[in-house]
UniProtKB/Swiss-Prot annotation:
<dbReference type="InterPro" id="IPR050061">
    <property type="entry name" value="MurCDEF_pg_biosynth"/>
</dbReference>
<dbReference type="InterPro" id="IPR005758">
    <property type="entry name" value="UDP-N-AcMur_Ala_ligase_MurC"/>
</dbReference>
<dbReference type="InterPro" id="IPR000713">
    <property type="entry name" value="Mur_ligase_N"/>
</dbReference>
<dbReference type="InterPro" id="IPR036615">
    <property type="entry name" value="Mur_ligase_C_dom_sf"/>
</dbReference>
<keyword id="KW-0547">Nucleotide-binding</keyword>
<keyword id="KW-0133">Cell shape</keyword>
<dbReference type="GO" id="GO:0071555">
    <property type="term" value="P:cell wall organization"/>
</dbReference>
<comment type="pathway">
    <text>Cell wall biogenesis; peptidoglycan biosynthesis.</text>
</comment>
<dbReference type="Pfam" id="PF08245">
    <property type="entry name" value="Mur_ligase_M"/>
</dbReference>
<dbReference type="InterPro" id="IPR013221">
    <property type="entry name" value="Mur_ligase_cen"/>
</dbReference>
<keyword id="KW-0961">Cell wall biogenesis/degradation</keyword>
<protein>
    <recommendedName>
        <fullName>UDP-N-acetylmuramate--L-alanine ligase</fullName>
        <ecNumber>6.3.2.8</ecNumber>
    </recommendedName>
</protein>
<keyword id="KW-0963">Cytoplasm</keyword>
<dbReference type="GO" id="GO:0009252">
    <property type="term" value="P:peptidoglycan biosynthetic process"/>
</dbReference>
<dbReference type="Pfam" id="PF02875">
    <property type="entry name" value="Mur_ligase_C"/>
</dbReference>
<keyword id="KW-0573">Peptidoglycan synthesis</keyword>
<dbReference type="GO" id="GO:0005737">
    <property type="term" value="C:cytoplasm"/>
</dbReference>
Length: 461
């Protein structure tokens, strides 16, 4: 790697790619990349000195001596084919992240849900306490002005992507595992295979390192039985964990609880972000912070300043008392947690707008979506965002609509397109409503358009 000076990223705007590209720029590498359209991520990289092309073409490679791609890039991609024709080394994004992690001590955050928020919280704890970590996150963290930052300290904090098994390429010193769910079954095919992958991941922890695991999660409890590496556990509901929380307060302005370590009181933890699940995420950051030598008071102060990660209960806008919030939630458990958080801070109706993500996820988890929307007063479902998948016969957004109606016994509003959703919401929204756009696709843009339309109507009125 040290002899390679020009790195080309195929799909440079992707959430797993652009942060690594930014770090490579900071290390002095020449960075080029391609994507199908410009984005905030590509514009930010260009401001840092990268060259970003808005189409895939052989000539984009230029004189690159290393090409980086993710699992999302198909093998017949024109740039990938050209790179192999030239005999250029092609590296998976996780291999490059692993190389970066070897330059420092890696802290990797894995799990079905909460990775981005927990990574952001952990990174902020180290950053605010003067440890100057390198940070690579899948979402935006306002405190660092993006999703990546090159630090000169001892640690690198990063998300570990289990969706394609590539987290097994990493060799962190510290691991956080938030939970294990039956997601990404298009890759793993069975829960047993998911558990086997996490077992291998946890076995990577060295004797000098630490695994931090949530004891509230039943599948993690299963993996921890007989686990022989250094480990600390945390929980909100399991008193056997090393880190526990009592006196939990879920209020409109603050989310708080009292933190204990092996029965000893450490102090109160207050968050500005809503949701009981965020207290759990914060407990993982507390465990890591104390392991690397930080005082609880400094950790708690940093977490109190945390304003949330991009697309994680993020305010899109507020017009005439109508709040529009966006969240990446796309798994039933994530949707349930997001809507419960909304219930904590709502002043009127909670309107859940969900764009299903992938045909395979809808196929495998369709019935479980039925119970995910219990805390929404109004539910709107759009067509599936395919993420490049081919349609599956008999699987559609109506699979989820039927599951919700069967579970809740009430009508779900099916609006296939974002435009239909915006038109409907402009007419039905009223002061006090909290409208949540949820999904891993492009449903966020409906929220932006809705805020724009509501503002226009306000001017006319």
């Amino acid at each position: 790697m040290d002899k390679k000076r020009h790195v080309h990223f195929i799909g440079i705007g992707g959430s797993g790619m652009n942060g690594i590209a930014a770090i490579m720029l900071g290390l002095g590498y020449r960075v080029t990349g391609s994507d199908l359209k410009p984005s905030a991520a590509t514009r930010r990289l260009e401001a840092l000195g990268a060259t970003c092309y808005t189409r895939h073409a052989e000539e984009n490679l230029g004189d690159a001596d290393l090409v980086v791609a993710s699992t999302a890039i198909p093998p017949d991609n024109i740039e990938l084919v050209e790179a192999r024709k030239r005999g250029l080394p092609v590296m998976h994004r996780a291999d490059l992240l692993a190389w970066l992690m070897r330059r420092q001590k890696g802290i990797a955050v894995a799990g079905a849900h909460g990775k981005t928020t927990t990574t952001s919280m952990t990174a902020l704890v180290l950053e605010k306490n003067g440890m100057d970590p390198t940070i690579v996150i899948g979402g935006e963290l306002s405190e660092i002005g993006g999703n990546a930052k090159l630090g000169r300290g001892e640690y690198l904090v990063a998300e570990a992507d289990e969706s394609d098994g590539s987290f097994l390429k990493l060799d962190p010193v510290i691991e956080i595992i938030t939970n294990i769910e039956d997601d990404h079954l298009d890759y793993y095919r069975s829960v047993e295979n998911i558990l086997a992958a996490f077992r291998r991941f946890m076995a990577k922890v060295p004797e000098s390192g630490l695994a931090v695991a949530c004891l509230d999660d039943p599948r993690l409890r299963e993996l921890l039985a007989g686990y022989d590496r250094p480990c600390l556990t945390y929980a909100l509901d399991n008193p056997e964990a090393d880190y526990t929380m009592r006196n939990i307060r879920l209020m409109r302005q603050v989310t708080a609880g009292d933190v204990y370590y092996r029965g000893g009181f450490l102090g109160c933890l207050e968050l500005s972000v809503p949701g009981r699940h965020n207290l759990s995420n914060a407990m993982a950051a507390v465990a890591v912070g104390r392991f690397v030598g930080l005082a609880f008071e400094g950790i708690a102060a940093a977490l109190k300043d945390f304003r949330g990660a991009g697309r994680r209960f993020q305010l899109t806008g507020e017009v005439n008392g109508i709040k529009v919030i966006d969240d990446y939630a796309h798994h039933p458990s994530e949707i349930k947690a997001t809507l419960k958080a909304a219930g904590q801070v709502k002043t009127g109706r909670v309107v859940g707008v969900f764009q299903p993500h992938r045909y395979t996820r809808t196929l495998f988890l369709g019935e479980r979506f039925g119970e995910a929307f219990e805390d929404a007063d109004v539910v709107i479902i759009s067509d599936i965002y395919s993420a490049g998948e081919k349609p599956i016969e008999g699987v559609s957004a109506k699979t989820i609509v039927s599951a919700i109606e069967k579970h809740n016994g009430r009508k779900v509003i099916y609006l296939p397109t974002r435009q239909e959703i915006v038109d409907y919401l402009v007419q039905m929204a009223r002061p006090g409503d909290m409208i949540l756009t949820m999904g891993a696709g492009d449903i966020w843009s409906a929220g932006i358009e809705l805020v724009k339309r509501l503002k226009e109507n306000q001017k006319i009125g």
